[in-house]
Amino acid sequence: MMPLLNTITTPYAEAFLQVAENRNEVDEVVAQSKSLLELWGQSSEFSEAMASPVLEVETKKAVLEKIFSKEITPSFLNLLKLLADRKRIGYLDAVLERLLELYREQRNIALATVTSATSLNEDQQAEILKTVQSVAGTDNLELNLKVDPNLIGGFVVNVGSKVIDASLSSQVRRLGLALAKVS
């Protein structure tokens, strides 16, 4: 995360995580954060409307209340309203990403981003999880699954600074480089 963005998001993320801990809502808040991040990423209309300076703060808060009042904890809804009041709701995704980073840091959870050519079924996810746990040297691991059809087949795993590239596109590229050296 960029330093300026980190300066904006960290106080909100730290404070909200502290509130969640005080109310014994951490697991619930983490799950809700992941769901909201997914919605934020999938619905550009929603995220753009919330970030728009044209839409009044009170209107944004009313929309947030209507959409989320039954879906998230009251403290989470208060965070959303606070971000709207402070004209920071456009940074919601960054605040939630930072909250998840802090959560993982506190619990020593490593994040592994797995990018595959197609969606992985549960058996494939479990197999990749075992492999990544042995490579990362920890059982405390969270998988972030992404799909990129450009990989053609296989997968790429990023854990911290380690990369496991078992994609077909990478193998084709390496084969092409090897053939270029031979000729």
UniProtKB/Swiss-Prot annotation:
InterPro entries cross-referenced by the UniProt entry: ATP_synth_OSCP/delta_N_sf, ATPase_OSCP/d_CS, ATPase_OSCP/dsu
Membrane topology: Peripheral membrane protein
Pfam families: OSCP
Main location: membrane
UniProt subunit comment: F-type ATPases have 2 components, F(1) - the catalytic core - and F(0) - the membrane proton channel. F(1) has five subunits: alpha(3), beta(3), gamma(1), delta(1), epsilon(1). CF(0) has four main subunits: a(1), b(1), b'(1) and c(10-14). The alpha and beta chains form an alternating ring which encloses part of the gamma chain. F(1) is attached to F(0) by a central stalk formed by the gamma and epsilon chains, while a peripheral stalk is formed by the delta, b and b' chains.
Function recorded in the entry: F(1)F(0) ATP synthase produces ATP from ADP in the presence of a proton or sodium gradient. F-type ATPases consist of two structural domains, F(1) containing the extramembraneous catalytic core and F(0) containing the membrane proton channel, linked together by a central stalk and a peripheral stalk. During catalysis, ATP synthesis in the catalytic domain of F(1) is coupled via a rotary mechanism of the central stalk subunits to proton translocation. This protein is part of the stalk that links CF(0) to CF(1). It either transmits conformational changes from CF(0) to CF(1) or is implicated in proton conduction.
Family: Belongs to the ATPase delta chain family.
PANTHER family in UniProt: ATP SYNTHASE DELTA CHAIN
Protein name: ATP synthase subunit delta
The species this protein was found in: Prochlorococcus marinus (strain SARG / CCMP1375 / SS120)
Species classification: Bacteria, Bacillati, Cyanobacteriota, Cyanophyceae, Synechococcales
